[in-house]
Design a protein with these regions (language model features):
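Redox-cofactor binding/interface segments in oxidoreductases and associated redox assembly factors
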Residues: 1
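A short alpha-helical cap/connector motif
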Residues: 4-110
Length: 110
């Protein structure tokens, strides 16, 4: 999946793909690891743009039925498999807001 680069569309693309995925099949999702803050801003402003694809990957890592690994190649390629999550991510909810350290993981503001 390498489409619109925006959270809502990427999430929709992955969920739709899961419906038709063969048993044991994999979904690959490109642009999962922005290196700079400017690479993940929506809407696109300038330069290299990965969008906020990474947010979908973080969210799906909290799902018990999706096993995900992220390869640190070509701006991040996430491998998604419908399977028991071998590394379930638990996000602590602090006063109704997601922990900003989790949301900004891997990003550096310029």
């Amino acid at each position: 999946i390498d489409g619109l680069h925006e959270y809502d569309q990427v999430k929709r693309d992955i969920l739709n793909s899961i419906k038709f995925l063969n048993k044991g099949g994999l979904i690959l999702c490109h642009d999962s690891l922005p290196a700079e803050y400017s690479e993940q801003t929506v809407p696109y402003t300038f330069g290299t743009w990965l969008g906020d694809v990474w947010k979908v990957i973080v969210e799906f890592r909290t799902y018990a039925y999706l096993d995900i690994c992220v390869c640190t190649i070509d701006h991040g390629v996430s491998v998604i498999k419908v399977n028991k999550n071998s590394n379930l991510l638990k996000i602590e909810n602090l006063n109704g807001k997601l922990n900003q350290q989790i949301l900004s993981f891997g990003l550096r503001k310029n």
